[in-house]
């Protein structure tokens, strides 16, 4: 089998294992946060940070949801990393943003964060703060979901079908899932350009 066929077969297998009911529940939680005047903070590291930035655009433009990602502000991100350290960079940014119970946190991560293994401790600390503040916590994560899956109000775990190709599929399916969210009738309030061109 060619690599292209293998990769597409793996993607098909992942898609068939996603739980539509869980995704609908996540949409309901996002809609509730928006409708009560909450904001959406989307956090990710590496490729997931780029996905977070794209998702912020979609939630703001398509869903009318006030959304932000800390990795969009490079000056603050690097200042906090330099002055306070990488593990607390997102939690401190959320404190500065006055995270409150009405808000929602969406974690995009390949592994979901794990303090014991020192993997994405910044996500773990941000989730802990969100828990303290009573904010809604959501995740689109892979592997076993890490701390995100343990602490979230709702979490989509992208299944691993080939341990050699975890990251490419995780980051690709983050986009599949958040695009499902922003195009969902419960969240979408504005037409996307190409669908509205006559």
Question: Locations of the language-model features?
Answer:
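Generic N-terminal amphipathic, Lys/Arg-enriched alpha-helix
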Residues: 1-18
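A short, well-structured juxtamembrane/interface segment
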Residues: 18-36
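Glycine-rich, small/polar surface segments that engage phosphate groups of diverse ligands
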Residues: 31-104
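Surface-exposed amphipathic alpha-helices with a cationic face
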Residues: 60, 124-131
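Glycine/threonine-rich flexible loop motifs
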Residues: 113-123
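Short alpha-helices
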Residues: 132, 141-194, 198
